Amino acid sequence: MLRIAGRKLSSSAATRSSSAFFTRNPFTFTDDSSSPARSPSPASLASQFLDQFRGFSSNSVSPAHQTGLVSDLPATVAAIKNPSSKIVYDDSNHERYPPGDPSKRAFAYFVLTGGRFVYASLVRLLILKFVLSMSASKDVLALASLEVDLSSIEPGTTVTVKWRGKPVFIRRRTEEDINLANSVDLGSLRDPQQDAERVKNPEWLVVIGVCTHLGCIPLPNAGDFGGWFCPCHGSHYDISGRIRKGPAPYNLEVPTYSFMEENKLLIG
């Protein structure tokens, strides 16, 4: 019962205070003269309205510019808001360095000069690398043609040149060699082939110097048939490069070649 009575009393008191506040006219303006009352301006009404609520807090709820108070701004913000062409430098923040020690100038000179030489060397290497990269590769050079001078080759001798990474045998045959190559019975050959099919000029025999067995290099002017002998597994080739004895299955390969002049041979 006591709690209910207390709640009724508190609610009735709040109702009376609020009704008293709203029944009171805080915005009444009177003039000292007997002139009729004037209607208040909006600015005065706002000021009086704010004055009614100032008692509810320790500080005024009005903005700082209405109360005449100006807060301090940082220097950077103040400079942005108030730009000026008069720039004042603070000399206290500038540090002056004394001139260098004369005894260390020679060392600095040598260090800088050495650095320039190093940079120049690096630039030179980069340029050389770029230029060399534009040249033909080894694979391209290997596929190029090879020109051979035949004037220095004596009859009955064999010379070896390198073409496409492989040795090429060039033999200048004598009349006896030519007759011996043509007198062979094709039925006795493992890889039958006439001598005329392997040469363009009977005097010159051009074959790739790689054994057709396992890729060894045969020895010229050797073997049982006066041609080539493979020391790896004992294959014998005759004066026309045909296999006559041993494990090799095929004759020595004949590359693509042509005679440019009487004593000029172009391989490839």
From Swiss-Prot:
Transit peptide: 1-56
Cofactor note: Binds 1 [2Fe-2S] cluster per subunit.
Record's catalysed reaction(s): a quinol + 2 Fe(III)-[cytochrome c](out) = a quinone + 2 Fe(II)-[cytochrome c](out) + 2 H(+)(out)
EC code: 7.1.1.8
GO molecular function: 2 iron, 2 sulfur cluster binding; metal ion binding; oxidoreductase activity; ubiquinol-cytochrome-c reductase activity
Mitochondrial intermembrane topological domain: 129-268
Keywords: 2Fe-2S, Disulfide bond, Electron transport, Iron, Iron-sulfur, Membrane, Metal-binding, Mitochondrion, Mitochondrion inner membrane, Respiratory chain, Transit peptide, Translocase, Transmembrane, Transmembrane helix, Transport
Protein name as annotated: Cytochrome b-c1 complex subunit Rieske-3, mitochondrial
